[in-house]
Design a protein with these regions (language model features):
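Peripheral, non-AAA+ core regions of ATP-driven protein-machinery
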Residues: 1-151
Length: 151
């Protein structure tokens, strides 16, 4: 996130790996961040860059995108040892997503300590995720309380 060249002239740019649903998640994330921080997101140029070469689409990255935007705007780093998944509603609620078992398996394979996931998805994981902390969340506030690294 960079200050825009003029008040209210900010943009949100997502690299070409994102499909339309992921771009919608970014717009929702910006609205939720505005509500949580009381900062006008249109005063920032936001560049969301998904690395790794694969295309993404769907709402699953909503929590991650929201946390990343808030982190950039507030200049508060995020933990790098936990994965996060979940759709975010305009009211900041974390909604269930698909593929949670695969995402948790990937987090464990990557050596992460844990995964934050929608509370409604907790039932989708069995006890085979030994060694991975499973943290169910209901709201973006829950996500940020766990993910932001505050002094």
């Amino acid at each position: 996130a960079f200050p825009a060249r003029g008040t209210g002239k900010g943009t949100i740019r997502f690299n070409d790996t994102a499909g339309s649903m992921a771009k919608d998640s970014a717009a929702t994330a910006a609205a939720v961040v505005r509500e949580l921080t009381d900062k006008d997101i249109s005063d920032y140029d936001l560049h969301i860059n998904v690395i790794g070469g694969g295309n993404i689409d769907g709402p699953s990255a909503g929590c991650a995108i929201t946390a990343a935007i808030l982190s950039a705007v507030e200049k508060i780093p995020l933990r790098q040892d936990y994965a996060v998944t979940g759709e975010v509603s305009l009211s900041g609620e974390v909604k269930p997503v698909g593929g949670v078992a695969e995402k948790a398996f990937g987090a464990r394979q990557a050596g992460l300590k844990g995964i934050l996931l929608p509370e409604e998805n907790r039932k989708d994981l069995d006890e085979t995720m030994q060694g991975l902390e499973i943290i169910p969340v209901k709201t973006m506030k829950d996500v940020l309380d766990r993910m932001l690294v505050r002094d």
